[in-house]
């Protein structure tokens, strides 16, 4: 997985994208074939996959959280399934936000575990079995759309309206993960985030393919006004510029902005530089939830940075507030239909009463 997309991916295709076109073609053929022909394990509960068309952040994690909250409101017990990218653990693990650190399980799983049961696993079939064994009656996959080894009942693809598909080329010449046609065929619906127009082309393609789409926006949680405040903003996420725009939308003046790689753990020198610069310039330090959990649980300067930082938390808010509940209902119906087909075909699902792995 690429942790930081090259800037040229998000501009009009230039000589680099065209030079890499043969590799993009080969990558696309392999990725498309895997999506179309992968053997997928049967799961006895509904599976919702929150993915995206491209490498990088589009808002998958806050979308997954919003769906989980809607599931809990319906009396369900949702469980998140994550690969645990950025963490060192290579065994299927139930994430404990009070015990684990991001360096072990990854930053996104720690955030998800604050909302609902969360399992990390490099082997998604094994992770799904663990969630079922732990009592989950709805599985929400955070990413994994292009490489899923599970039967998916509802695939929601999130697309950022300011970035869209970037230059439109497939990795490594651009940010697209697999041929768009194959991705659309495998998708159930799209979620367009924000009010930009960069995603309009893919939305029109989805409409022609009879795929519904929802709209949503990222909203700052709580009263996080920063009017007139001079800040040092730092972010190690896929799209730091989006975070900086959010900070400025709260009325802050960003005097210093520091960007790091997605999922990157800061070095002692980088932490010291942030603290020293903020103290020297008299700046408030602001950061993202992901960066905050990566720093949490450490000692020394990292602990001091945690103490000094204000976290800007965001929620994914659907324009139609009933949409998350509708997505869950559709997934439940699709799961029932899938299980009937599987039973007729003699396909066995992951045991509903499996022993913990």
UniProtKB/Swiss-Prot annotation:
Source taxon at top rank: Bacteria
Function: Transfers the gamma-phosphate of ATP to the 4'-position of a tetraacyldisaccharide 1-phosphate intermediate (termed DS-1-P) to form tetraacyldisaccharide 1,4'-bis-phosphate (lipid IVA).
Record-linked InterPro entries: LpxK, P-loop_NTPase
GO term, biological process aspect, one: lipopolysaccharide core region biosynthetic process
HAMAP family linked: LpxK
Protein name, entry field: Tetraacyldisaccharide 4'-kinase
NCBIfam families: lpxK (TIGR00682)
Residues annotated as binding ATP: 54-61
Organism name: Rhizobium johnstonii (strain DSM 114642 / LMG 32736 / 3841) (Rhizobium leguminosarum bv. viciae)
Listed pathway(s): Glycolipid biosynthesis; lipid IV(A) biosynthesis; lipid IV(A) from (3R)-3-hydroxytetradecanoyl-[acyl-carrier-protein] and UDP-N-acetyl-alpha-D-glucosamine: step 6/6
Keyword annotations: ATP-binding, Kinase, Lipid A biosynthesis, Lipid biosynthesis, Lipid metabolism, Nucleotide-binding, Transferase
Matching Pfam families: LpxK (PF02606)
Annotated Gene Ontology cellular component terms: plasma membrane
Molecular-function GO term, any one: ATP binding
């Amino acid at each position: 997985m690429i942790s930081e997309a090259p800037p040229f991916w998000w501009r009009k295709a230039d000589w680099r994208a065209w030079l890499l076109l043969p590799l993009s073609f080969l990558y696309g053929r392999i990725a498309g074939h895997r999506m179309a022909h992968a053997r997928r394990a049967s799961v006895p509960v509904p599976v919702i996959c929150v993915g995206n068309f491209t490498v990088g952040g589009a808002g998958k994690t806050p979308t997954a959280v919003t769906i989980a909250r809607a599931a809990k409101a319906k009396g369900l017990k949702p469980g998140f399934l994550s690969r645990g990218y950025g963490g060192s653990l290579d065994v299927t693990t139930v994430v404990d936000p009070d015990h684990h650190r991001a360096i072990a399980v990854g930053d996104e799983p720690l955030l998800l575990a604050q909302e609902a049961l969360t399992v990390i696993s490099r082997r998604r079939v094994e992770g799904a079995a663990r969630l079922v064994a732990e009592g989950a009656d709805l599985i929400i996959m955070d990413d994994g759309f292009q490489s899923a080894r599970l039967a998916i009942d509802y695939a929601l693809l999130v697309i950022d309206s300011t970035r869209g598909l970037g230059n439109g080329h497939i990795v490594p010449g651009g940010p697209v993960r697999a041929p768009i046609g194959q991705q659309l065929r495998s998708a159930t619906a799209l979620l367009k985030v924000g009010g930009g127009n960069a995603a309009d082309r893919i939305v029109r393609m989805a409409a022609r393919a009879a795929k519904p789409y929802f709209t949503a926006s990222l909203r700052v949680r709580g009263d996080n006004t920063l009017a007139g405040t001079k800040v040092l903003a730092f972010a190690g996420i896929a799209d730091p510029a989006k975070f900086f725009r959010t900070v400025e939308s709260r009325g802050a003046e960003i005097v210093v902005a520091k960007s790091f790689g997605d999922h990157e753990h800061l070095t002692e020198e980088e932490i010291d530089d942030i603290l020293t610069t903020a103290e020297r310039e008299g700046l408030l330090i602001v950061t993202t939830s992901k960066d905050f959990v990566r720093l949490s649980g450490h000692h020394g300067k990292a602990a001091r940075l945690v103490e000094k930082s204000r976290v800007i938390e965001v929620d994914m808010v659907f324009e139609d507030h009933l949409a998350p509940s509708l997505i869950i209902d559709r997934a439940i119906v699709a799961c029932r239909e899938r299980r009937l087909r599987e039973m007729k075909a003699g396909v066995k699902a992951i045991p509903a009463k499996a022993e913990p792995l």
